[in-house]
Amino acid sequence: MLKGRSLIDPMDFTVDELEEIFKLADDIIACPKEYMHAAEGKILATLFYEPSTRTRFSFETAMLRLGGQVVGFSEPNSSSVSKGETIADTIRVVSCYADIAAMRHPKEGAPKVASMYSSIPVINAGDGGHQHPTQTLTDLLTMRRTKKRLSNLTIGMCGDLKFGRTVHSLIKAMSRYDNNKIVLISPDELKVPEYIKKEILDKNNIEYKEAKRIEDVIEELDVLYMTRVQKERFFNEEDYIRLKDSYILNENKLKTAKKDMIILHPLPRVNEISYEVDNDERAYYFKQAKNGMYVRMALMAKLMGVL
């Protein structure tokens, strides 16, 4: 039963509960008009303490396509937060007005705190470099629909694996499915944190290896998950400038890749995927973004108990 629950971490739901969400998303994709009144009278509050275009638009569009409405803020300066209001007080007040809330915050753990004081479901829309569970649902749905499975996959994760919350969440999620292999492709400065290796990969006996060049491992991959080097996570601009062009995927590097490999990216991209790749049949990142709207529709409908 998902009604009334929050989603803070991709591990909050069982594999069976995730499948329930994915099946509803499949149904919505097949016939979206059947669900256009599902959330009539319901209100989503978007509490975005950090800039976002795609995630916020995806949540808002998802709620509107369910027939609901949206209130909220897209930067803290436009809310009582700028006056010093705590997260606990903000969510208590928001709970009086809305039926569900989506929160993005630069501090790790902020959505978790909000969920502890909230009387409505809270969805973590990204907290610092920590977790991004709805992007993970998007990634899983896309793999499930294209590869027809979430097990027995070799997944390459490339770019910023240190600060990339989407990568951390996806590694967590994929560790729950059988016989997956993870290939971590990054420069030394942006390697996946040790706690991810110890607490998730090693603890769950997930096979993984590290590489420094895409071309050395691309022929093994069923999925290539590209990420951008995130300027906002760097304290030193010189380090950002030095590392931002570390990995650029182009058609030449795809020559040895499997014909049915899929390329994913949480977006926005900067220059890590050449525009020439957009026309490759393996490029799925824009379809992936659309899947994000559908999976958020399914998730919110389940948490509100309207479907």
Swiss-Prot record:
One BP term from GO: 'de novo' UMP biosynthetic process
Q: In which pathway does it act?
A: Pyrimidine metabolism; UMP biosynthesis via de novo pathway; (S)-dihydroorotate from bicarbonate: step 2/3
Q: What range does the record give for the signal peptide? A: none
Q: What is its EC number?
A: 2.1.3.2
Q: What SUPFAM superfamilies does the entry give?
A: Aspartate/ornithine carbamoyltransferase (SSF53671)
Which amino acids does the record list as binding carbamoyl phosphate? 54-55, 104, 132, 135, 267-268
Q: List the disulfide bonds.
A: none
What InterPro entries does the database record attribute to this sequence? Asp/Orn_carbamoyltranf_P-bd (IPR006132), Asp/Orn_carbamoylTrfase (IPR006130), Asp/Orn_carbamoylTrfase_sf (IPR036901), Asp_carbamoyltransf (IPR002082), Asp_carbamoyltransf_Asp/Orn-bd (IPR006131)
An example molecular function term from Gene Ontology annotations: amino acid binding
Per its record, the protein catalyses: carbamoyl phosphate + L-aspartate = N-carbamoyl-L-aspartate + phosphate + H(+)
- Name the residues that bind L-aspartate: 83, 165, 228
Q: What class of enzyme is it?
A: transferase
What keywords would UniProt list here?
Pyrimidine biosynthesis, Transferase
The annotated subunit structure for this chain is: Heterododecamer (2C3:3R2) of six catalytic PyrB chains organized as two trimers (C3), and six regulatory PyrI chains organized as three dimers (R2).
* PANTHER family hit by this protein: ASPARTATE CARBAMOYLTRANSFERASE, ORNITHINE CARBAMOYLTRANSFERASE, MITOCHONDRIAL
HAMAP family registered for this protein in UniProt: Asp_carb_tr
NCBIfam families to which the protein is assigned, alphabetical: asp_carb_tr (TIGR00670), PRK00856.1 (NF002032)
What is the stated purpose of this protein? Catalyzes the condensation of carbamoyl phosphate and aspartate to form carbamoyl aspartate and inorganic phosphate, the committed step in the de novo pyrimidine nucleotide biosynthesis pathway.
Similarity remark: Belongs to the aspartate/ornithine carbamoyltransferase superfamily. ATCase family.
| Name listed for the protein in its UniProt record | Aspartate carbamoyltransferase catalytic subunit
